[in-house]
Amino acid sequence: MKKTILLSVVASTMMMAGGNVMPVVVEPVVAEEKVDMGEVFGQFRTFYIDRSYSGIVNNNRNSLAMGGYIGYKTPTFNGFSAVIAAYGTYGFDIHDEDADILGTASYDPSLYGDAFDNYAFIGQAYINYAFGNTNIKVGRQRLDTPLAGADDARMLPNLFEAAVVSNTDIQDTTLILAHVTKESVGTFGNVYGAPSALSLQSGYGLGYKEGTSGEFADMGVIALGEGTNTDGVTAGAVIYKGIEGLNLQAWDYYAHDILNAIYLQADYKLSTVKLSAQYINESDVGDALAGSVDSNYWAVKAGTSFGGLSGYAAYSQTADSDNASMNGGILTPWGGMPAFTQGMVTRHMFFSDTDAWKVAGSYKFSDLGIKASVYYVEFDVGQSNTYKPGQAWTASESGFDIQYDVAAVKGLNLRFRANFPRDFAPGLDWDEYRVIANYNF
């Protein structure tokens, strides 16, 4: 009876409402569109270095610094984006005398600016435009190319003012065209003390001091010193990866009124074996501000790997050339250091009439996030070298490098490395240790 009454009430209600029951409409929940606010990126670095000299010099020096960079990348709009990044380093006073006392022997200069400066500056500021397979980047930026590069071996890297165009329209091929006008020299350059033939053949020109402490100086001035302003360096490259296991690259650097440098490299990997070769040729151009340049270097490398274990051996040779700049040694004023046979600090393989060989091995403990490496390199330096003219000697360097990626802290890398040059110059030895913490975000 109760059911009958209830059905009657429902039926009456439906009739009064016109007999149609309208379903309840549930409005869909619309997720708020995420607004692209751009990206903050950077690296915080803490660096401790300790070097003890022996032989013709007896001294211990060490430094502790903190710094790095922080930057912002805008959202992309119609292919355009922009980046700005500030760089800086601050060295701590860990000795009784201050680091800014020029000529102090207690502090290592490679973590500071010129004259042990603490400094900060805008190191990157560029506009990027991407369309199709082409990318254009104009402004202050980091470069990592064979003969002009960041050389990020201490607190702050080399940075450049440049326009760079890259294109991948051709299958398996990357084309690069760049024009570089200025460089700001990173803190590593200060390890050379004063510009010299040593610095010029080790990545830092005769005018590198003009570009320290965050200053950007003309590429010609960086290479050869004051009064050698030029139109910069124009570079082009072709990188080809169309054959399985084979990677070919060819670079040409036209340093206006100084030199033209050609860099070639081939890498071939077959199963666990990798074979590589490289070649550098330099010749003077235009007003020949560096004098007659006639330099040639070549090197080969063979490596193999098995599981987490890998190793390689390399050999290089730089020819001599009478009456040429650096007697035929390779001029590398803009941080480029691609040599297979370089040490952690010793870069004598680019000296005139010098043969070098190197062996190295590493092991990855993948489960622990640890990679450990060891190496030994030897340089047979000829008498025509311009670092110690008229002297022939054998220099060597051994060392190790241990890196630990901390799993509990994303982006944190801890590093302990050391180098032990013997007869860097005849009778000059040292032991150097570095402890580095990098936090990338």
Regions found by a protein language model. Name each.
Residues 8, 12-143, 163-169, 173, ...:
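Beta-barrel outer-membrane channel/assembly domains of diderm bacteria
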Residues 1-4:
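Positively charged n-region of N-terminal signal peptides that target proteins for export
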Residues 325-351:
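Flexible internal linker/loop segments at domain or repeat junctions
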Residues 54-58, 110-113, 148-151, 221-224, ...:
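Extracellular loop and loop/strand-boundary signature of outer-membrane beta-barrel proteins
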Residues 47-61, 65, 147-157, 282, ...:
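Outer-membrane beta-barrel proteins
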Residues 132-136, 154-331, 376, 380-382, ...:
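Signature for the C-terminal beta-barrel architecture of outer-membrane proteins
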Residues 60-64, 114-121, 155-157, 228-230, ...:
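Short sequence motifs at beta-strands and strand-loop junctions characteristic
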Residues 47-49, 104-106, 140-145, 214-217, ...:
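Flexible, solvent-exposed coil segments and beta strand-coil junctions
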